[in-house]
């Protein structure tokens, strides 16, 4: 290959080369200026600026002061070179305490004056300049994560007329809830809001009131206290992620347009202690009322129009001890439930009864803490009354099994058998098995094919793993393998090429008579 064919980029029009350089970190983009005189001046037209002081560790021993000086001089030179040219995106990350905050403010004011539309700031111990919150050009604003990045709204005018995305992570919002309300009220066209680790358990209230909002992520790590009051007035919201300790009260919950919700509500340590998961304390053969340790009923009623719902294991716990009665989810067509060995299924019978139009049920693990209260949907103790599963409208059941639970007593297989015995409308059972060990997948498929499908004789059964997809009918694989796939974080192989297709019925033949031999 000759030089001409290898240097095709240089032959591109200058605006195209500048656009390509905009996708590089600014330090790397600047280094291309030594390639030729033409490239030296092209760098001045890059519209995306990305500065990170950690990029200045060049292998030579330098003090923090020296590194900070090199970093600040570089940023100064770049901004001076560009003059008053327009800026699309400005990203600045400063993790070194020796960076001069006055110069940082100057950089931010520089790009604000040049009409920046995306601003991404992560700066240690930095009070954000108020000029950010009256920008007429910002479309996306990301603040944090950083320790002691402070948002002080000490002026009356907060107005971001074009802002559509606001991302706040580990930012200290002054004036507590009032400052936060002031910020949101100044964003008249906001569509996406991400709130990460704000730590508002000490606020008097938190209110998210944005009529134009379509997507909301509300996440806070483990806290020792319950937020006092949380309200949502977002009538056009279609997507919600909410993970936090339950609030003491939810005065207003307006999710009239909600389509999909991922709920990770949890009890605090004190509430978990009060709940005391001992069944002899709160449950008996009679139907003794369990103790409520909080109240999330108003919030759950507020999301009852949702169509797709994901509940974490902790949220199932909240349903049990903080919701009475469980609301009716008339629009719900897909429900995903996460389980673990410490969570009970007490609330599942009531939840499933109140999902009259549910089509797809997804269970991440089947292990849970057994007791008599979950017997309506569980095989651990056969209920005296008919199971709510007998009237279940579910057509597709998806189960995620993991090879790390050392489960050797057959309880998960018995639970699957119980589902097949009780769910009359079931058309498809898909088991995602997180293992690369093919013989284990084959053995699981063999056991599943032997289960008598009493309530759903026409139910198709599939087992999908990293390398194999085993199906009772091969055509069903072709339509399901690439439809609703398991989460990427648990199953990174789902984007790989299709695995080998095997019809286990050809290998194993018809199922034997109903007995327990298929378990072992």
From Swiss-Prot:
Annotated Pfam families: F-box, LRR_At5g56370
> Is the Transmembrane keyword given for this protein?
no
Per-repeat ranges for LRR: 170-197, 219-244, 340-365
Q: Which cysteines link up through disulfide bonds?
A: none
Q: Which InterPro entries match?
A: F-box-like_dom_sf, F-box_AtFBL13-like, F-box_dom, FBD, FBL60-like, LRR_dom_sf, LRR_FXL15/At3g58940/PEG3-like
Write down the PROSITE patterns for this protein, in alphabetical order: FBOX
Q: Which residues form the F-box domain?
A: 6-54
Q: Where are the transmembrane segments?
A: none
Record key words, sorted = Leucine-rich repeat, Repeat
From the Swiss-Prot or TrEMBL record, give the protein name. Answer: F-box/LRR-repeat protein At3g59200
Organism encoding this protein: Arabidopsis thaliana
Lineage at the top is:
Eukaryota, Viridiplantae, Streptophyta, Embryophyta, Tracheophyta
